[in-house]
């Protein structure tokens, strides 16, 4: 299986039914092409936005929980200590867009791409995003 870093925006989009995020997770559930990985802090980020997600989502609490469980079962959380050695390189590449440094450092460590809808991130490092 190929590794693919997933950012919090993709997880949120899958719950909101925006874009193709949920479809990608559903297809991967069948095809098993990717091992999705994310920094451990992604769940902290997700929880920060949970009330906003609940307001914007057209899903019931039960449906949202089901989707979140389905998505999170496919994502392996990686400890910061496993990719700390790539953080300075990621920060240098991203310059003033430091909020995504963990995702890039993880992608650099695993030599893989990033699944993200962040336009600025894509512009700064199109080779990986």
Identify the role of each PLM range.
Residues 1-38:
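Short, well-structured N-terminal submotif of metal-dependent ribonuclease cores
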Residues 6-7, 37-40, 95-100, 118, ...:
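Histidine- and aromatic-rich ligand-binding microenvironments
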Residues 10-11, 42, 103, 120-121:
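Alpha-helix capping/helix-boundary segments
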Residues 12-15, 89-95:
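Short, flexible loop segments at the rims of nucleotide/cofactor-binding pockets, characterized by
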Residues 15-16, 50, 125:
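Short, flexible helix/strand-to-coil boundary loops that buttress conserved ligand/catalytic motifs
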Residues 18-20, 59-61, 95-97:
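Short gly/ser/thr-rich secondary-structure transition/capping motifs
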Residues 27-33, 37-89:
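PIN-domain endoribonuclease scaffold, especially VapC-family toxins
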Residues 104, 108-129:
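Acidic, PIN/NYN-like endoribonuclease modules and their adjacent C-terminal/linker elements
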């Amino acid at each position: 299986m190929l590794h693919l870093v997933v950012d919090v925006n993709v997880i949120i989009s899958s719950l909101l039914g925006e874009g193709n995020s949920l479809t990608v997770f559903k297809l991967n559930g069948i095809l098993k092409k990717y091992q999705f990985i994310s920094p451990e802090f992604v769940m902290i980020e997700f929880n920060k936005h949970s009330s906003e997600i609940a307001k914007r989502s057209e899903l019931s609490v039960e449906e949202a929980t089901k989707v979140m469980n389905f998505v999170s079962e496919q994502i392996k959380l990686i400890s910061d200590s496993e990719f700390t050695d790539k953080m300075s390189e990621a920060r240098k590449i991203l310059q003033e867009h430091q909020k995504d440094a963990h995702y890039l450092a993880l992608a650099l460590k695993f030599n893989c791409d990033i699944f993200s809808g962040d336009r600025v991130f894509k512009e700064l490092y199109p080779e990986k995003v």
